[in-house]
Amino acid sequence: MYNFLVKKSKCTETDALLIPYFEEKTNIPNQEINNKINIIKKKEQFKGSYGEIFNITRTTEDNIQDIILLGLGKETEITKEKIRRAFGKAVNEIKRLKSKSVFLRFDSVEAIGLENTLKAMVEGLALGSYSFNKYKSDKKEEVEVTVHIGGHNIKEEEIEFCEKVIDEAVLLSETTCLARDLVNEPANNMYPETLAKEVKNIGSKYGFEVEVFDENQIEELKMESFLSVGKGSDNLPRLIVMRYFGDKDNMDQRLALVGKGLTYDSGGYSLKTNAGMVTMKSDMGGAASVIGAISAIAKRNLKINVIAVVAACENLISGHAYKPGDIIGSMAGKTIEILNTDAEGRLTLIDAVTYAIEKEKASEIIDVATLTGAALVSLGEDVTAVITNKDEFYGELREASYETGEKVWQMPSFEDYSKLIKSNIADLKNIGGKYAGTITAGLFIGEFVQNKPWLHLDIAGPAFSEKKGDYCPTGGTGAGVRTLYELANRRCK
């Protein structure tokens, strides 16, 4: 856990001194440190290349201090995301040195500005320090690290502003890690009922209303599509509705965040392989994303109205489970031919979207889902595939993503693609064939948005990682939380 303070404390009083360093000459007022850096640079032990880390130990009057040099490369090439990644790497060095207090020598990067530089540094450290070890019997106690942020360029009158920037960065990191925790919980502990209970606790903490509908209430709402997916499990489905009204003068404007909430997905009778099932606790990554986003929005008291909806269930096999060849209904009244029970997420989402529009009066929709393997094939592990019916809405998302470093890419949605999901014996079929799988899955949901401005975010790539990143460990990443928050935040300015 990292705590952050802005103050004019002495840099010699901490266990470590963290110095961001560009390849070009970095101005460091302390002559002793400058001399040490010049020596190691002459010996070519450290150049300041991007991501390079070098440690020097020095003795002060009453302390032995580690000086961590963090290479940022060329200043002309630095970005907010590069800063985040570099500081995420620095966490490993701080951990290796067992530092409990760190002085971060802060200088604003002129091209990025004070706010963005500071925010990226804090997010890199806070997100990079995340770990999920609650099930390890020999887990080490979490070390609390205090980061003192200072520098000769921080003016006295800027301290309060810097503290506000840090507060926002810490909150976004916290709610991103909240989403990571939800995804990382094993499915034997995180099933629809326990997820609903957890969301109630989260709502109490962050300041939003939560209402949970049980299976009988869901049936009364005629959400047959959602219920069909969960029929094979003994863990009964739950519809989780979160409400935050920060702009009560404009109650007709309500942004709905709809997250896919498959707490486990075996594929049903269209069964996945064992390897394909191992990580399927992560199939509620969309739900985790919208829960994290509304938590941050509510805690910051943004002037916006947000509804978050999660249709939580498990897709398993039993004598009650739905089958390929079935025809099912939906809350919107449309019928669906089931060709593949592993194309289940879209079936839960369409009822959740219909609920958001008809019962919660949503004026705009963003659905977030770990929906298709095709998104991974087309865009890789780090990019969110996006379908929209309004390019201006996508433009908002794209601008927000530039701020957060979470990559998004708009997929085509030509009218011809919609023909691929038409059924001969029902209104629609739940899979469009082997081509354009990400697009047809998104357009299937688009059939239910009732002409509302809509974004579909397929986070199948970035939501769960099997390799460690610079500021994200293996497992749930919390993809989408910061970008959804940023989109909402920009509307309030």
Curated annotation (Swiss-Prot):
Residues reported in the UniProt entry to bind Mn(2+) 2: 260, 265, 283, 344
Listed InterPro entries: Leucine_aapep/pepB, Macro_dom-like, Peptidase_M17_C, Peptidase_M17_leu_NH2_pept, Peptidase_M17_N
Subcellular location: Cytoplasm
GO cellular component: cytoplasm
GO biological process: proteolysis
PROSITE patterns to which the protein is assigned, alphabetical: CYTOSOL_AP (PS00631)
GO MF annotations, alphabetized: manganese ion binding; metalloaminopeptidase activity
Its job: Presumably involved in the processing and regular turnover of intracellular proteins. Catalyzes the removal of unsubstituted N-terminal amino acids from various peptides.
Protein name, as recorded: Probable cytosol aminopeptidase
Source organism of this protein record: Clostridium perfringens (strain SM101 / Type A)
Higher taxonomy: Bacteria, Bacillati, Bacillota, Clostridia, Eubacteriales
